[in-house]
């Protein structure tokens, strides 16, 4: 008798994706982040669903409803902090996942990579709208500042901003629609993640050497299912340590003050995972220029397949490119630090230098280093 796992129309899809999937035998722990992102998404959807049962998206009661969740709902504090810190874990895994893709040349799978960049944008939009929902000071002013950036678009800017707001300022209409979008987007993310996997399984996984590994593949289960489970346990350990010991470590104290349109906080800044983009935005004195730089700082990822000049796929055997890659990582840390600092000397200058370096490495230095390596390695 044939195995139902291999014949049933639905179960066989799962089988080909997670059980009998041919996987390169040499993929390292850097390949764990895809499954960790799946775990983060499940945690966020489940905790978010329970929060939505108690939350009210009204300017008068939103802040109080979050307080009610933390004080009166059974384990509400746990659900709330898991959801808030779950976003941070999500972005840590996302950045490491993208970094792995850049280092090992995974971007040569065009479709998988481009869907991944769209996923990154969608997750960022979802996180931004989620940050507005508790209706604290930083929620309100963050929403005001970031949505206001759209007014830099010539001709239609102001109309567009008022259309998004649903009025002449961030108010009840804005909060309600942000809640609606924040609720629905994770399900769209889940659908996009399935498309991401679909395209990945068309080509098969990349591996650290960047070479074709068809001759050396092993089944996903039990080898990599066990490896992924270890990753899950490590992630849960770090995540729950953060949630149970220092739940407010990555948050902003200003968000414990209810939103007040008449009182601006001294330093308006987004959550830590947006600070690098915020620093790039602030480093350009022109409003439209800043908005374009902000957009391009993420969209630039889509150019990587075009800018790949090396005759080798991975950076594993390319020391010059490796060096530039780690300078880029250090530069992103610098930008993240600058994004959280006040707009004054010397932070403005450091931010501008770091922003120029960010775009220079990606657009000029990496392609040039790749061509040089081709010459040096006699390709």
Curated annotation (Swiss-Prot):
Main subcellular localisation: mitochondrion
The record's free-text note on cofactor binding: Binds 2 heme b groups non-covalently.
CDD domains according to UniProt: cytochrome_b_C (cd00290), Cytochrome_b_N (cd00284)
Membrane-spanning segments: 33-53, 77-98, 113-133, 178-198, 226-246, 288-308, 320-340, 347-367
Cellular location(s): Mitochondrion inner membrane
Annotated residues for binding of heme b b566: 97, 196
List of residues binding heme b b562: 83, 182
Pfam family, one: Cytochrome_B
Required cofactor names: heme b
Residues where a ubiquinone binds: 201
Highest taxon listed in the record's lineage: Eukaryota
Keywords: Electron transport, Heme, Iron, Membrane, Metal-binding, Mitochondrion, Mitochondrion inner membrane, Respiratory chain, Transmembrane, Transmembrane helix, Transport, Ubiquinone
One of the record's GO cellular component terms: mitochondrial inner membrane
Membrane topology term: Multi-pass membrane protein
A single GO BP: mitochondrial electron transport, ubiquinol to cytochrome c
Signal peptide stretch: none
MF terms (GO), sorted A to Z: metal ion binding; ubiquinol-cytochrome-c reductase activity
Subunit structure: The cytochrome bc1 complex contains 11 subunits: 3 respiratory subunits (MT-CYB, CYC1 and UQCRFS1), 2 core proteins (UQCRC1 and UQCRC2) and 6 low-molecular weight proteins (UQCRH/QCR6, UQCRB/QCR7, UQCRQ/QCR8, UQCR10/QCR9, UQCR11/QCR10 and a cleavage product of UQCRFS1). This cytochrome bc1 complex then forms a dimer.
Purpose: Component of the ubiquinol-cytochrome c reductase complex (complex III or cytochrome b-c1 complex) that is part of the mitochondrial respiratory chain. The b-c1 complex mediates electron transfer from ubiquinol to cytochrome c. Contributes to the generation of a proton gradient across the mitochondrial membrane that is then used for ATP synthesis.
Misc. comment: Heme 1 (or BL or b562) is low-potential and absorbs at about 562 nm, and heme 2 (or BH or b566) is high-potential and absorbs at about 566 nm.
Family per record: Belongs to the cytochrome b family.
PANTHER family listed in its UniProt record: CYTOCHROME B
Stated name of the protein: Cytochrome b
Organism of provenance: Glaucomys sabrinus
Gene name as annotated: MT-CYB
């Amino acid at each position: 008798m044939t195995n139902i796992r291999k014949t049933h129309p639905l179960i066989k899809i799962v089988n080909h994706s997670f059980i009998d999937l041919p996987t390169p035998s040499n993929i390292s722990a850097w390949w764990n982040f895809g499954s960790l992102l799946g775990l983060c998404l499940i945690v966020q959807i489940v905790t978010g669903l329970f929060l939505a049962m108690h939350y009210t998206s009204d300017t008068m009661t939103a802040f109080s409803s979050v307080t009610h969740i933390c004080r009166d709902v059974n384990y509400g504090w746990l659900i709330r902090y898991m959801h808030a810190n779950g976003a941070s874990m999500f972005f840590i895994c996302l950045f490491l996942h993208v970094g792995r893709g850049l280092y090992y040349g995974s971007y040569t799978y065009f479709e998988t990579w481009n869907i991944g960049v769209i996923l990154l944008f969608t997750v960022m939009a979802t996180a931004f709208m989620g940050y507005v929902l508790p209706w604290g000071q930083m929620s309100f002013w963050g929403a005001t500042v970031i949505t206001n950036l759209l007014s830099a678009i010539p001709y239609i800017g102001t109309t567009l901003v008022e259309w998004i707001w649903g009025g002449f300022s961030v108010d009840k209409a804005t909060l309600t629609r942000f809640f609606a979008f924040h609720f629905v987007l994770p399900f769209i993310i889940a659908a996009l993640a399935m498309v991401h996997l679909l395209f990945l399984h068309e080509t098969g996984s990349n591996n650290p050497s960047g070479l074709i590994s068809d001759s050396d593949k092993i089944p996903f289960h039990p080898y990599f299912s066990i490896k992924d489970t270890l990753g899950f346990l490590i992630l849960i350990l770090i995540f729950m340590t953060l949630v149970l010991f220092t739940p407010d470590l990555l948050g902003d104290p200003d968000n414990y003050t209810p939103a007040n349109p008449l009182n601006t906080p001294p330093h308006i800044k987004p959550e830590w995972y947006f600070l690098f983009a915020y620093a790039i935005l602030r480093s350009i004195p022109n409003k439209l220029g800043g908005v374009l730089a902000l957009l391009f700082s993420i969209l630039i990822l889509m150019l990587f397949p075009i800018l790949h000049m090396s005759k080798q796929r991975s950076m594993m055997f390319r020391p010059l490119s490796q060096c530039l890659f780690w300078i880029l990582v250090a530069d992103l840390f610098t930008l993240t630090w600058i994004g959280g600092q006040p707009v004054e000397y010397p932070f403005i200058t450091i931010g501008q230098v770091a922003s120029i370096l960010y775009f220079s490495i990606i657009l000029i230095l990496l392609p040039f280093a790749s061509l040089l390596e081709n010459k040096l390695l006699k390709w």
